[in-house]
Amino acid sequence: MSMKSQFERAKIEYGQWGIDVEEALERLKQVPISIHCWQGDDVGGFELSKGELSGGIDVTGDYPGKATTPEELRMDLEKALSLIPGKHRVNLHAIYAETDGKVVERDQLEPRHFEKWVRWAKRHGLGLDFNPTLFSHEKAKDGLTLAHPDQAIRQFWIDHCIASRKIGEYFGKELETPCLTNIWIPDGYKDTPSDRLTPRKRLKESLDQIFAAEINEAYNLDAVESKLFGIGSESYVVGSHEFYLSYALKNDKLCLLDTGHYHPTETVSNKISAMLLFHDKLALHVSRPVRWDSDHVVTFDDELREIALEIVRNDALDRVLIGLDFFDASINRIAAWTIGTRNVIKALLFAMLIPHKQLKEWQETGDYTRRLAVLEEFKTYPLGAIWNEYCERMNVPIKEEWLKEIAIYEKEVLLQRH
């Protein structure tokens, strides 16, 4: 049976449940995923005075072909984007500034240091998102930044975050799509603290100072990101979920939920509906934690599908900003981007092809047998036929065909790098 015939047959199967496949494919086209640049160079960045990777973050593996220049990183991103259906965004950290061979401290960064990224994004029709980098730096070596007891160090990081928001505003204005500027800090303690309140008070005061700088929200959206623990902050993290949830609600900021930043038995999918009742928007960093915040490449697993279901069934595609955050240096880095991003898009398609109205009715009337049975049956409905058609229409390879492109690129480009 031809691929087109498989698609038409699958359309009929889904259509029996009142699911409009064509409408789902049109909706899917409109959903941008924010693809993190740091998978391409193992969270290295391009600072001239480069610090060791810190902040409780670790990248394992030594696969050949890592990008070592901005040009190489952009070229690799272009390759990945050519294999991923849809129009998307690229997420940058401050350490990816281009300073023309001059040492520019992070609190002195300006929009001009990202002009090449903006020109590139314009050329490819991409949005850009941004993050201040509060790790891998001499002034973060003791694991404290915005909550540091030393006012001078604290001010350095406050100024860096203010500079980052201005860069985000520049991105949004130039590219005519709001930039999400997200603040994550590594601050915490390895062992049990004797005072949990004071560092949080300092963090609150730092954030208040950062957000007091006026920025046009039409161009820049502010987000704050929590974490349960990191290497070196096992016992206490200043920016906990409760801290940022409260701060975001009170100050009208976005909460960003990273799927690897919670207890292993705690799921982000279970938080989305609760937060949508109280927040206009929220943001995600989709990752795959294996026993801890290991940032494995995202797979098409139960939690990814459940996150997609929560977004789609609650009609929140325009309220939940979806980004990625994983890094694996043990496999081809362009393949890592491709696998993870395609899986997120595939999960959204899966969620769009579910009879949500009927399932909700069964839940409301107490028919839990039908609810469970049908949800399980839909796991083996012909999603693959619809996905292949979508990829074909979006001019990207179907199924695993994209691996051929990766193999050619690896041989001709990646393995030539030294």
Swiss-Prot record:
Pfam families with a match to the protein in the record: RhaA
Function: Catalyzes the interconversion of L-rhamnose and L-rhamnulose.
UniProt pathway annotation: Carbohydrate degradation; L-rhamnose degradation; glycerone phosphate from L-rhamnose: step 1/3
Cofactor note as given: Binds 1 Mn(2+) ion per subunit.
Gene3D superfamilies on file: Divalent-metal-dependent TIM barrel enzymes
Name of the protein described by the UniProt record: L-rhamnose isomerase
A GO BP annotation: rhamnose catabolic process
GO cellular component, one term: cytoplasm
EC primary class: isomerase
Localization: Cytoplasm
Keywords (A to Z) from UniProt: Cytoplasm, Isomerase, Manganese, Metal-binding, Rhamnose metabolism
Binding positions (Mn(2+)): 261, 293, 295
Catalysed reactions listed for this entry: L-rhamnopyranose = L-rhamnulose
Source organism, top-level taxon: Bacteria
Family recorded in the similarity comment: Belongs to the rhamnose isomerase family.
E.C. number: 5.3.1.14
Cofactor(s) the record lists: Mn(2+)
Cited PANTHER family: L-RHAMNOSE ISOMERASE (PTHR30268:SF0)
GO MF assignments: L-rhamnose isomerase activity; manganese ion binding
